[in-house]
């Protein structure tokens, strides 16, 4: 099913924001400008443009828009293995729709409650509320972890164990600033560097 260009998660928020702005304009005229600023901000936040993933079969694509904050070899706490971890930090101006980095079947899903420290920090990976998916692809096991941030306090995930995902397929949403960690086999080769801006569903993070 094709997703609307404005994420469904934001429809009620936008209805309230623009409704309040219109009422404020009618009641207080030019003093309603802050209401309109908030409404426009909400509109850009909940945008969800269609993306066409690259055709490269060996590519692992970014699950989110944002900035690379980590590229390192670590211990994957979900599959108890050594792994290459690539982390994408999303600020409040990024698209917050989350997309599958690979084609594959969901073998497990783990939800962990936690705190809400700044998602730009490494400790967010282990301390914050998070939702992890183990995606088994033909080229290797991938774990994608949605992590709540300082402002984001709601992780939405619409898939379950046994579902199949296509690379670039939308599977979740995190409201406001947050982070996604991707754990890959150590044989994967990173294609991004720290500080690089990436586009969800389009930028290649690594190759198998």
Curated annotation (Swiss-Prot):
Its main location: membrane. Pfam families: PS_Dcarbxylase. GO terms for molecular function: phosphatidylserine decarboxylase activity. It comes from Thiobacillus denitrificans (strain ATCC 25259 / T1). The modification Pyruvic acid (Ser) is found at residue 178. Is synthesized initially as an inactive proenzyme. Formation of the active enzyme involves a self-maturation process in which the active site pyruvoyl group is generated from an internal serine residue via an autocatalytic post-translational modification. Two non-identical subunits are generated from the proenzyme in this reaction, and the pyruvate is formed at the N-terminus of the alpha chain, which is derived from the carboxyl end of the proenzyme. Binds 1 pyruvoyl group covalently per subunit. This is Phosphatidylserine decarboxylase proenzyme. It catalyses: a 1,2-diacyl-sn-glycero-3-phospho-L-serine + H(+) = a 1,2-diacyl-sn-glycero-3-phosphoethanolamine + CO2. HAMAP family: PS_decarb_PSD_A. One of its GO terms (cellular component) is plasma membrane.
